[in-house]
């Protein structure tokens, strides 16, 4: 990234007018944002860093400060004849976010087209204040490898499906890059993004992405990183760090669609991936098959329960953990300490819970830490930490 881009300040009309404050640090240069995040990380991990060992903190990895996001979660507001895709502003107004700077230009254009789609279909937006209407959210995910899309309509009931199906052929003819379309039924009058029922309106049910020549698949309910540019560097770094230990066996806990494990896998490595979301596991299995990996097992289980059910004899050479914001928890920390693999690679989206977990992982020391700025203009970031057995 050039210094000119790093030191520029993004001018966002939504933020300047107080309509959307999600990117709370957008008026700071990206370099300054990353410096603050780095200092936060240093302070949190200071208790685990030996004196004169600052070199284990590697330079932070950054990407573009606009056009990087691959997922849009749009609240549908307004009325059927004049829908608005975006958010409710702090003052309570409906704000159209189709031109949000975080989205690539082609994604912005498609969001505008989807606004017209809602209008043409006559889909009444759900009114929270009156508990009436049908269309709650439009969720759009973009694959960078081909610029293809997964489109989801979140409805209160089945009543709007026929209207969507009526207008869908024209939309798909205009945008053949929309490969997956589904309807999610969320009948509850609560601030819940999605329900249990997913109805596919296309034959294809998954979107293909590719990082560092590793095929990954996205289904409607599977978690996927929202910043492909930096995520690819995160996975590649993990691959390089793990390779230094030449493991013959790996566990990838909280594996999602398998991004970390599949990057580190080879035909000589036995890989076990654990993830509670069955859709994500189905995606990981598909990737492994496409890569021709045979010594791979992905299972839809709770990671902590999986570890509790294993004995020391089952331990792998190396364990990867990539938990949600809550961290891995004390019970799993204890299991990892008892298994005592050669190394533990911890990818964290919440350095506070990373620090808390490090207190409970016994018999290990940090050898490398690196910050990945997957979430520019916010307080959030990803951390990769390598722990090696004492």
Swiss-Prot record:
The keyword rRNA processing applies. Its EC number is 2.1.1.189. InterPro entries: 23SrRNA_MeTrfase_RlmC, MeTrfase_TrmA_AS, MeTrfase_TrmA_CS, SAM-dependent_MTases_sf, U5_MeTrfase_fam. It comes from the Bacteria. S-adenosyl-L-methionine binds at residues 225, 254, 275, 322. GO terms for biological process: rRNA base methylation. Pfam families: tRNA_U5-meth_tr. The active site is at 349 (nucleophile). Keywords: 4Fe-4S, Iron, Iron-sulfur, Metal-binding, Methyltransferase, rRNA processing, S-adenosyl-L-methionine, Transferase. The keyword Iron-sulfur applies. One of its GO terms (molecular function) is rRNA (uridine-C5-)-methyltransferase activity. [4Fe-4S] cluster binds at residues 12, 20, 23, 100. It catalyses: uridine(747) in 23S rRNA + S-adenosyl-L-methionine = 5-methyluridine(747) in 23S rRNA + S-adenosyl-L-homocysteine + H(+). Catalyzes the formation of 5-methyl-uridine at position 747 (m5U747) in 23S rRNA. Belongs to the class I-like SAM-binding methyltransferase superfamily. RNA M5U methyltransferase family. RlmC subfamily. NCBIfam families: meth_trns_rumB, rumA. This is 23S rRNA (uracil(747)-C(5))-methyltransferase RlmC. It comes from Shewanella baltica (strain OS195). The lineage of its organism: Bacteria, Pseudomonadati, Pseudomonadota, Gammaproteobacteria, Alteromonadales.
